[in-house]
Regions:
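Short strand-loop junctions, especially beta-strand C-caps/beta-turns
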Residues: 74, 79, 103-107
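A short helix-loop-beta-strand connector motif used in the catalytic cores of GNAT acetyltransferases and
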Residues: 39-49, 141
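Conserved catalytic-core motifs of GNAT/GCN5-like acyltransferases
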Residues: 103, 116, 120-140
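Conserved beta strand-loop-helix elements of the APE1-like EEP
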Residues: 147-154
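Conserved GNAT acetyl-CoA-binding A-motif
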Residues: 96-111
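Short amphipathic alpha-helix that is part of the acyltransferase structural core
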Residues: 1-31, 35, 49, 145, ...
Length: 190
């Protein structure tokens, strides 16, 4: 399996990845198409496509910040789930050599409990601080999520940095923008 960065929004594989994204996440957790295109212009944003035998196997939309990698969206093609693809994507992301941060729904029903166990098996730990992800789209409110990180829980300073980066950089690409314009110039991606 290969994980490659896609910068071309017209690439047929990326268009299939966007279909997977729309099928895998509820509407309130998705960017609008123009916002997705804008995010792809940001050097810190990586639309990573997992390919197996030339076909789309999954995706990881992530942000490569100086001190950590933030996995904003991760999903696997439904017919390929349970075959270790998600684990391999996470293992490849770990090659960045810095902490990896992601968010999950609170483990309150079977699917979210299974999702938390999956990430724990992959070496992630739940952080105990309260976290509300801002809305991506008009008409929605922020939603409560659990922050997980690998290889350890985040320090107070790291939590504050994540909250700031989420508000000022990641959510810049939301409609309406949830943040002010950040400075540019982060280092190259994974």
């Amino acid at each position: 399996m290969r994980l490659c960065r896609c910068r071309d929004a017209q690439n047929p594989l990326f268009l299939r990845a966007m279909d997977l994204y729309r099928q895998s996440f509820p509407e309130h957790e998705q960017r609008l198409w123009p916002d997705q295109l804008s995010a792809m212009e940001d050097e810190a944003y990586h639309a990573l496509l997992a390919r197996r035998e030339g076909e789309l196997a999954g995706l990881a939309f992530c942000w490569d910040f100086d001190a950590y990698l933030y996995v904003e969206h991760l999903c696997v093609v439904p017919r390929l789930r349970g075959q270790g693809i998600g684990q391999r994507i996470l293992a490849l992301l770990a090659c960045a050599g810095k902490p990896v941060v992601l968010e999950i729904d609170p483990p309150e029903e079977e699917i979210s409990i299974r999702r938390r166990h999956f990430y724990e098996r992959c070496g992630y730990v739940a952080n105990s601080f309260a976290h509300v992800h801002p809305p991506y789209r008009p008409g929605f409110t922020g939603h409560r999520l659990v922050v997980m990180s690998s290889p350890r829980v985040l320090s107070q300073e790291e939590r504050e940095r994540f909250a700031r980066d989420l508000r000022l950089r990641v959510m810049r690409y939301a409609s309406p923008p949830a943040a002010e314009k950040p400075e540019s110039g982060l280092k190259k991606g994974c």
